[in-house]
Amino acid sequence: MEIFDYDNVLLLPRQCRVESRSECDPSVEFGPRRFKLPVVPANMKTVLDERIARWLAANDYFYVMHRFDLDALAFARSMREQGLCVSISSGVKPADYAVIDSLATSGVGADYITIDIAHGHAESVRRMIAHIKQRLPEAFVIAGNVGTPEALIDLENWGADATKVGIGPGKVCITRLKTGFGTGGWQLSALKWCARVATKPIIADGGIRHHGDIAKSVRFGAAMVMVGSLFAGHEESPGDTVEVDGRLYKEYYGSASDFNKGEYKHVEGKRILEPVKGRLADTLREMREDLQSSISYAGGRQLSDLRRVNYVILGGENAGEHLLM
């Protein structure tokens, strides 16, 4: 098995077949809807809030609302009243079962439900998938997080409509340091490994540092890419703004950090400061343009054409050209 990550791989260009990069279509069909980009902001308190979720949904971007200090039923009802997509997160605790039940009994429902725990290859996840499928059979269920083909196969067999791949590769995640486990440092290999056995869509979650990493994720099997740090630190971001040496920053912390949990127990995340980047809409526009450029370099016109390119691994024992692997 090859071991590599985003910084160790470059994609190889093919003959360009468009007159302008703007002809390339980076949109993606994911579940029952089509979205402008194969990118979703991480469902974290310092990345998005209800206001940002509404804006994303209204502008045809995928989102997953976080589950922390949130009245999920009220949020879902508000989105329904505005004719917007309802996409929420769920844990596996009794309170999470109650949320699913309330969405069902109220008739509000949900379009997407993401079961989101640090180690998703668990019986608790199997039970929650079954509960959602029973109570909200029309919902598109995303489950995770996992890091091995064995785990992905199980989640698919348990009924997940998509799986989230990535254990601890994020910028504010310290799972591998605290536990010795994870996909940090080889996230792209883990994605490739899992994609080989997948029969349903994969969300690559974590480790994205540059816009080009989105194209690499699609190349190695991702249908959607979850991004945290690149979406944190915007003017609209919900984190507190602080000034350091005359420069503005926004706080950004992991969902398993003590800042998010409110206690120092089973901590696998940390807090950092992200420079304020400007407006979210500008970042999304730039991501779209960069992904259009990636598709043109792939000799294609649509997102799936990225999966046809060759790649090289830079340095190490696996260095060399790889053909359509």
Curated annotation (Swiss-Prot):
The keyword rRNA-binding does not apply. It comes from the Bacteria. The active site is at 173 (thioimidate intermediate). NADP(+) binds at residues 202-225. Pfam families: IMPDH. GO terms for cellular component: cytosol; GMP reductase complex. InterPro entries: Aldolase_TIM (IPR013785), GMP_reductase (IPR050139), GuaC_type_2 (IPR005994), IMP_DH/GMP_Rdtase_CS (IPR015875), IMP_DH_GMPRt (IPR001093). It catalyses: IMP + NH4(+) + NADP(+) = GMP + NADPH + 2 H(+). It is an enzyme of class 1 (oxidoreductase). GO terms for biological process: purine nucleotide metabolic process. GO terms for molecular function: GMP reductase activity. Keywords: NADP, Oxidoreductase. Its EC number is 1.7.1.7. Catalyzes the irreversible NADPH-dependent deamination of GMP to IMP. It functions in the conversion of nucleobase, nucleoside and nucleotide derivatives of G to A nucleotides, and in maintaining the intracellular balance of A and G nucleotides. HAMAP family: GMP_reduct_type2. Belongs to the IMPDH/GMPR family. GuaC type 2 subfamily. PANTHER family: GMP REDUCTASE. This is GMP reductase. It comes from Leptothrix cholodnii (strain ATCC 51168 / LMG 8142 / SP-6). The gene is guaC.
